[in-house]
Amino acid sequence: MRVIIAGNKTDDTENIKKYLKEEGYNIVAEVSDGFDAIKVCRQHNPDVILMELEIPLLDGICVSKIINNEDIAGAVVFLLKDYNRYVIEKIKMVGARGCIFNPIDKNYIISTLEFARYTGKIYREIKKEKDNIEKKFEDRKVIDKAKGILMLNERLTEDEAYSKIRKYSMEKRVSMREIAEFIVISN
């Protein structure tokens, strides 16, 4: 697992680093501020970024929003000093996949990161599938609109209009949506 650690160098982060290395995890980068956290996530797209909530330049909440919006890390896990219901609600809202509290325990850290990676992977797969379905739906809307135009202007049946779009698509080696957009724009 590829991990980025973002936060101040403390005994806790050093212990975490030691535990992760003992388990064979690859610590891709260690950074001390929010700006660098985003920068290294963009470069390395880690499985997990383990981040303190309060880090310089951009706080963990802002960093998590950006990471999740840009999909540049599999999961965000926060390192928290202690339990605070308000903070937990905030980090849930920005898409964090977990949090680790003091005192630091090796098994707790490893299991939290493993679950975070797993749920992050599932989330990415579902999001990819959702995006694909949305794209197909949008394609279908444009193609249906183009079919309607062809049916009206050329007095074709729906099947004939679809076949015409498909034929042009194959001849020009472009997607049916591109042909459909051309038909819609040129009408």
Residue ranges and their predicted role:
Residues 7-29:
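Two-component/phosphorelay signaling modules centered on CheY-like receiver
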Residues 32-48:
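Acidic, metal-coordinating helix/loop segments flanking the phosphotransfer/catalytic sites
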Residues 33, 59-62:
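Acidic catalytic/metal-coordinating carboxylates
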Residues 46, 60, 91-97:
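As written
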Residues 52-53:
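Active-site residues of response regulator receiver
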Residues 61-72:
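Short amphipathic alpha-helix used as the core "switch/output" element in two-component signaling
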Residues 104-113:
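C-terminal output helix
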Residues 131-187:
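C-terminal output/effector regions of signal-responsive regulators
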